[in-house]
Amino acid sequence: NKYITGLERTNLLNAIADKYNLDVFTGNEELNIEKAVMHKSIDYYSRMPEVFRKSKINLNMTLRSITSGISLRVYDILGAGGFCLTNYQEDIAKLFKDGEELVMFTDENDMLNKLEYYLLHEEERMAIALNGHKAVKKFSYDNVLEYILKYIALT
């Protein structure tokens, strides 16, 4: 449920902020990550792409209630040219290559290990971000619409 996911996210963000510089952009004024730099929500369409692109690591944590599909944030991060570190979701693994186009983690310890690794390995991190940016292009509206129209024609 949403409450449990909120607690998990807060715990993960606190664990990150205990070791690393962390900026959090949120519309949730009640969220307080003590050691993080908290930012108010900014315009998702005009300003967030720049944040995604300029951040060393962008974290995606899918709601527990989402058992299939992919958060739009994954596409947005990759589309902006950002490096995406996301919790493991089977559907993400079907569409993107872990460790080549984005990076997935399975638990808090795995996430912290991967954060440390990719902060220390900038060239590898940047190559993964570039590969992710290239990979997400196949999901443009034109390509998806073409796929849907072909699928409809076959049925």
Where do the model's predicted regions map?
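Nucleotide-sugar donor-binding catalytic core of glycosyltransferases
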Residues: N1-I66, F83, Q89-I92
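Glycine-rich phosphate-binding loop at the start of an alpha helix
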Residues: Y45, P49, S71, M126
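Glycine-centered loop/turn motifs
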Residues: D98-G99
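Conserved acidic donor-binding segment of nucleotide-sugar-dependent glycosyltransferases
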Residues: L102-E108, Y118-E122
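Hydrophobic alpha-helical packing elements
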Residues: M111, E124, I128, V144-I148
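A short, well-ordered alpha-helix in the C-terminal region of glycosyltransferases
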Residues: E124-K138
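C-terminal alpha-helical cap of glycosyltransferases
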Residues: Y141-T155
